[in-house]
């Protein structure tokens, strides 16, 4: 994978680097952390000499050898699946422990659908960026001095490693209708920075959304047009505009402040086909699909209605959509839930109530059935492990995860048969024996 050769063909330096990887593969990445990778490799070479596996002369020669790895544009690693892979790692760690996970020689077949995973990632990114751009421009990610060669300085600015569509760039000059930019040069495996200086332009039309600054953002740029957004020395993210052949055109980007998550599941088997737990795994490994507990809000209402349909109500049953007051307890203000429209519509059928997501009907329904019954159904669907039996919970005031809620909706799509989320299809040990299989 790293050197595109068999084990017996490896040099001492190459073998030493591979031996250095298991402790912390990401810390010794040959591209992103080249200096640390070479230092760790050389330490391993030194230990090989100390323990008599190689001579001192061989050690010195091997340490001087540059770290050259085969860079692949395609291969087994899917950047879009980092959140999925990390969730699988957590489950394996919980099941087999650290020794079993890293030394057990396990072969794991997951439920991941690579095509769906790529679509999921792009869809979430598109939604987050659209929402974030509506909030306005927050300014550059950094600023550098432009005196002399800007390449080495720009190369030191940390960029997102798992958003390959984006590049870091420094603004070289700004006119009324466009900004001239210089792209971040790649670091060489042998150390140093590429001497090539790639340039491009960001036309005003590709940064027009940024002419409105976000609330609280400091306006560093002055003037009109492109100069109202960017200044020379600004370090920003850009994305290549496809289909332009006469010159390299880029569009202005910014990392969204808003977070989100997406889960795609086979509703009949519970197999998780795709998971995206955030905009960038490199920026934040926190998986918002499995680890973030959030209020489901109105997406919880179908389960209140499911409890009602199981307990004497029908789709044509009438429930009053009108003002309702709930005593919250001694010293607490009276709770008066309202519909989103802030209107009431009188007696309405259950079908209309769920179609229009009526708050007052849902609360009145939960009050009539009793919240203990709603709590029981919430647990049976796997949305909550525990839920306080208070009426606001019928409007989704409790907390759950995207994965739990997806599993609950999958149960509905599966005709009411319970669906359990699964990331792993099969696990085999080093001898090929199946030690786990998801039924």
Task: Report the location of each language-model feature.
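Non-catalytic, structured segments within soluble enzyme domains
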Residues: 1-185, 365, 372, 376-386, ...
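Conserved catalytic neighborhood of penicillin-recognizing serine enzymes
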Residues: 8, 75-78, 268, 313-374, ...
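A short, well-structured edge-of-sheet supersecondary motif
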Residues: 10, 167-186, 253-282, 381, ...
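Beta-lactamase-like hydrolase cores
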Residues: 11, 127-139, 157-166, 222-229, ...
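Active-site SXXK
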Residues: 48, 120, 269-270, 293-321, ...
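Conserved active-site-proximal loop/helix segments of enzymes involved in bacterial cell-wall
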Residues: 106, 386-390, 411-439
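Beta-strand/loop nucleic-acid-binding surfaces
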Residues: 189-229
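Short active-site loop at a secondary-structure junction
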Residues: 217-225, 255-260, 283-303, 315-322, ...
């Amino acid at each position: 994978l790293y050197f595109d050769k068999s084990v017996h063909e490896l040099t001492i330096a190459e073998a030493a680097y591979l031996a250095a990887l298991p402790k912390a593969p990401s810390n010794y990445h040959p591209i992103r952390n080249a200096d640390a990778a070479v230092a760790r490799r050389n330490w391993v070479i030194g230990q090989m000499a100390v323990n008599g596996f190689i001579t001192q002369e061989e050690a010195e020669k091997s340490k001087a050898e540059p770290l050259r790895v085969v860079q692949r544009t395609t291969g087994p690693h899917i950047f879009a699946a980092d959140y999925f892979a990390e969730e699988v790692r957590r489950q394996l760690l919980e099941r087999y422990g650290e020794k079993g996970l890293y030394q057990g020689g396990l072969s794991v077949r997951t439920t991941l659908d690579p095509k769906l995973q790529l679509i999921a990632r792009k869809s979430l990114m598109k939604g987050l960026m659209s929402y974030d751009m509506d909030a306005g421009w927050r300014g550059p990610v950094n600023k550098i001095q432009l005196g002399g060669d800007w390449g080495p300085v720009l190369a030191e600015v940390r960029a997102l490693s798992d958003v390959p569509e984006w590049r870091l760039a420094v603004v070289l000059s700004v006119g009324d209708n466009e900004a001239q930019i210089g792209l971040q040069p790649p670091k060489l495996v042998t150390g140093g920075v590429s001497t090539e200086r790639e340039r491009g332009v960001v036309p005003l039309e590709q940064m027009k959304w940024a002419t409105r600054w976000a609330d609280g953002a400091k306006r560093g740029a002055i003037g009109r047009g492109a100069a109202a957004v960017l200044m020379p020395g600004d370090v920003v993210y850009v994305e290549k505009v496809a289909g332009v052949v006469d010159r390299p055109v880029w569009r202005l980007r910014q990392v969204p402040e808003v977070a989100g998550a997406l889960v795609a599941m086979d509703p009949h088997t519970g197999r998780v086909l795709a998971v995206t737990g955030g905009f960038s795994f490199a920026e934040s490994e926190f998986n918002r699909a499995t680890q973030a507990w959030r209020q489901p809000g109105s997406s919880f209402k179908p389960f209140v209605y499911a409890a009602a349909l199981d307990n004497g109500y029908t789709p044509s049953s009438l429930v009053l959509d009108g003002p309702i007051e709930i005593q919250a307890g001694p010293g607490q203000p009276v709770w008066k839930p309202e519909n989103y429209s802030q209107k009431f519509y009188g007696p309405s059928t259950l079908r209309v109530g769920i179609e229009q997501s009526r708050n007052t009907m849902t609360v009145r329904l939960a009050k009539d059935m009793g919240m203990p019954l709603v709590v029981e159904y919430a647990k049976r669907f796997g949305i909550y492990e525990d839920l306080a039996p208070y009426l606001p919970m019928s409007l989704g005031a409790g907390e759950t995860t995207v994965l739990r809620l997806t599993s609950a909706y999958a149960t509905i799509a599966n005709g009411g048969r319970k669906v359990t989320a699964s990331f792993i299809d099969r696990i085999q040990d080093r001898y090929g024996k199946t030690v786990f299989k998801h039924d």
